């Protein structure tokens, strides 16, 4: 099964997430099929908090990819902002 989820990056206590399409069996931060964007929960000032290619996300959802709960809410947020 293919899922759209977040892969954690960044430093200790400074999370930064890539939003990726991956096989459900692969590790959280491991192999992925395609990168759709990023999410920075600690963005300050002029930093971008969320960047997501909504068209690619919609295409993967149409193909049957299942988004995680958090990614589903981020897709909704990105659509509203666009």
From Swiss-Prot:
CC terms in the record's Gene Ontology section: cytoplasm; small ribosomal subunit
Residues passing through the membrane, by range: none
GO biological process: translation
InterPro entries reported in the protein's UniProt record: Ribosomal_bS16, Ribosomal_bS16_dom_sf
Keywords on record: Ribonucleoprotein, Ribosomal protein
PANTHER family cross-referenced by the UniProt entry: 30S RIBOSOMAL PROTEIN S16, SMALL RIBOSOMAL SUBUNIT PROTEIN BS16M
Protein family (similarity comment): Belongs to the bacterial ribosomal protein bS16 family.
This protein's name: Small ribosomal subunit protein bS16
Source species: Francisella tularensis subsp. tularensis (strain SCHU S4 / Schu 4)
Recorded name of the encoding gene: rpsP
């Amino acid at each position: 099964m293919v899922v759209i989820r977040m892969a954690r990056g960044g430093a200790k206590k400074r999370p930064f997430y890539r939003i990726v399409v991956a096989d459900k069996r692969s590790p959280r931060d491991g192999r992925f099929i395609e990168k759709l964007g990023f999410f920075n929960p600690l963005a300050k000032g002029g930093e971008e908090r969320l960047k997501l290619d909504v068209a690619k996300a919609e295409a993967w959802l149409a193909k049957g990819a299942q988004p995680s709960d958090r990614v589903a809410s981020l897709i909704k947020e990105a659509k509203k902002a666009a």
